[in-house]
């Protein structure tokens, strides 16, 4: 499992540069680069900042990493992935829209 590959995957899905992710996660561009390339470990604090930047949980980042191969490709087709892995891949605005839709559907069931 390589957290760096998952971070790169998520960053690219958001259309962000390493500098943008560094700004969002309160670290330097070189730290992001080193993390993505496996040249640096990660602290709980940086994982929390990254999760906040990606609007997800730390566990979702780990789950995504577990479902990636050594080249950073997803191992399974989307129909067999855990819902968290699918959700985290979506742009943040789509995640927000889906959350709103889900909460609306739940409220109508009450």
Swiss-Prot record:
Disruption phenotype: Deletion of the gene results in a 100-fold reduction in transformation. InterPro entries: Cro/C1-type_HTH (IPR001387), Lambda_DNA-bd_dom_sf (IPR010982). This is Competence pilus inhibition repressor. Represses transcription of the PilB-specific inhibitory protein CpiA. The keyword Transcription applies. Pfam families: HTH_3. Residues 7-61 form the HTH cro/C1-type domain. CDD domains: HTH_XRE. Keywords: DNA-binding, Repressor, Transcription, Transcription regulation. SMART domains: HTH_XRE. PANTHER family: DNA-BIDING PHAGE PROTEIN, TRACRIPTIONAL REGULATORY PROTEIN-RELATED-RELATED. It comes from Acinetobacter baylyi (strain ATCC 33305 / BD413 / ADP1). One of its GO terms (molecular function) is DNA binding. Residues 18-37 bind DNA. The lineage of its organism: Bacteria, Pseudomonadati, Pseudomonadota, Gammaproteobacteria, Moraxellales.
């Amino acid at each position: 499992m390589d957290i760096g590959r998952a971070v790169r995957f998520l960053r690219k899905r958001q259309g962000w540069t390493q500098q943008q992710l560094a700004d969002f996660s309160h670290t330097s561009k070189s730290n992001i680069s080193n993390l993505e390339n496996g040249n640096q470990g990660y602290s709980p604090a940086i994982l929390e900042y990254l999760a906040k930047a990606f609007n997800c949980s730390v566990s979702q980042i780990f789950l995504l990493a577990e479902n990636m191969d050594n080249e950073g490709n997803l191992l399974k087709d989307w129909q067999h992935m855990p819902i968290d892995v699918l959700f985290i891949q979506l742009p943040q605005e789509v995640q927000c829209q889906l959350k709103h839709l889900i909460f609306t559907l739940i409220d109508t069931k009450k």
